[in-house]
């Protein structure tokens, strides 16, 4: 008993805290021990150091937390603590790791949280069973090298004064958690990539400028590098496929930008994957795909529902306020343009390869050129009208052509500086030259004995090549003869057609002078008929009825009157586009309407686009005065085009004045671009008849440009409103006239017809104007 009392007195002398009342010398407080589970209960505050040592000898758990000890208790020498596995010396005033604790060879967990430790002795190497070490909230400036030779699994060194990590940190092969947050670390050594078992890495609140790329080789689950000076996340971090939590707030990040980082981990890794594809464009497809994540369902803000983390893909809501001002909002609205560019590049690449290998590649499709497979044939053959349509500028007539054909023409015009459908002479010349090259390269003189000694398969191949060449030569010769025949017949028909035109103009003038200008059917005259199909002997020149210069000859050109001359025979046909190019036209007079008989017989007309082109061209010519045509039947096409262009400009100017006057707005110089989204036109329709367009898609400050789908919806709503108000169908423009800015003249006709149906505006009251002079006189 005396010895026990002496130990208690010595412990009390070592303890510098207050002494409990009643003579109890073990009144030191004992707080909870972080890292070692729940601390002792309230009754432990009165336990003596001696009882703590006795319990450590029995249980193997030493708890001396919160006793303000400056050194290890000396009474520990009286107890066998060699089997201690867990030691809690936190919340004391120790300046170094006690030497007594370094001899606990069975120690697995050591907690030195919140002390004054500045040095770790080398004797710590004796703790070869230590797996958990908490030295946070101390005054360490460096981690000693010998600390990296321990079998640690958890190392917590936060809230110290560390300026760097030792390169030997890579020796901690079994380390799963490393916490060095709240220090002054400026760089992380590349050897951290050797920590093949690391799962949790926390470098929060340091002075890091960059992240080591070697960290991408570590199977991290949690990464926290917030509150640093990091500007770029390495692209290789996309390989962190096991990462579930990444915390990166309070960093001046530039790549990925902040708009992507706030959306969460999924978007960050998508961005890194896209950047990797840009850096290495030759990556195979399977490496371009984003890597999967193992059980990866958490985001940056775990309490936030995942549905709110919208990527913005396919988002066309113009009122969305999630986008920042400097983030592109119409990044995906031009997807068709990107697809078109990709298709163009692929096509050009294929054609260049074909041109290089053209002389050495055997064609097996019966003598047809390989590049002709890329041509979308219309009416089963390629015509001169098609070639001319490709070469004409954008101001060509689009009213008579289908949208599919116009898209086809535009695609060919963009993808080729020179049209792949070459003129006949050039195309045949190239075929002949290719055949000559092929013949010189492949026809090598051989001896008959060698031919007999060749295997049968080789002989069959040679015979097939010869037959193929013969078929190609025959087809070329046949095509050449047909082209020459077509050219001769074209000249003859051109002469005959001019004579027919003069006679028809004279007949029309006589008929107009003798008949009432009202619409009537002259007796004995049928409607104007057109050939239902082209001549069978032509392949490269389509021969149609040339109605150029005939005002009143065509059923479409003379809408108030019927045609007055007999149908033309099939041989009296000529290429319309060769003499008069088609131009984009508008209907000038809203009072014109098609005859009922023409509408009844409309399904019997041929469906060829060439027929529609001829009809449209003659509709343009029909607006000229018959007297002028009778006096000068052979008018210069250039003058007609110039005249039509001037009329179109007048219509466009009139359209601008109408809109500005009705809506009290000032339109920009580019009127077509101002009307493309359909907003102005929808407001104009509502001005004529309120609520005729119930909903209008308008731009917003966040999304200043409407998507093509919303622009088309506005335009279609405007045209529907025009139909409901009463605009005739023949005066309605097409949506592509507005969306593609290719038919402002037709839009002007539609707007003019719409405004004619508007109620007359009441004149402003005159009373204030009459009183104004009286007031000024007073």
From Swiss-Prot:
The modification Phosphoserine is found at residues 324, 415, 419, 608, 625. It is found in: Cytoplasm. Residues 645-758 form the Calponin-homology (CH) domain. Residues 514-523 have a biased composition (Polar residues). It comes from the Eukaryota. Residues 56-290 are annotated as: Mediates interaction with DOCK7. Pfam families: CH, LRR_8. Residues 511-536, 758-778 are annotated as: Disordered. SMART domains: CH, LRR_BAC, LRR_TYP. One of its GO terms (biological process) is septin cytoskeleton organization. CDD domains: CH_LRCH3 (cd21272). Residues 768-778 have a biased composition (Low complexity). The keyword RNA-binding does not apply. GO terms for cellular component: cytoplasm. Keywords: Cytoplasm, Leucine-rich repeat, Phosphoprotein, Repeat. LRR repeats lie at residues 56-79, 81-104, 105-127, 128-150, 152-172, 173-195, 197-218, 220-239, 240-264, 266-290. Residues 382-642 are annotated as: Mediates direct interaction with MYO6. Component of the DOCK7-induced septin displacement/DISP complex, at least composed of DOCK7, LRCH3 and MYO6. As part of the DISP complex, may regulate the association of septins with actin and thereby regulate the actin cytoskeleton. This is DISP complex protein LRCH3. The lineage of its organism: Eukaryota, Metazoa, Chordata, Craniata, Vertebrata.
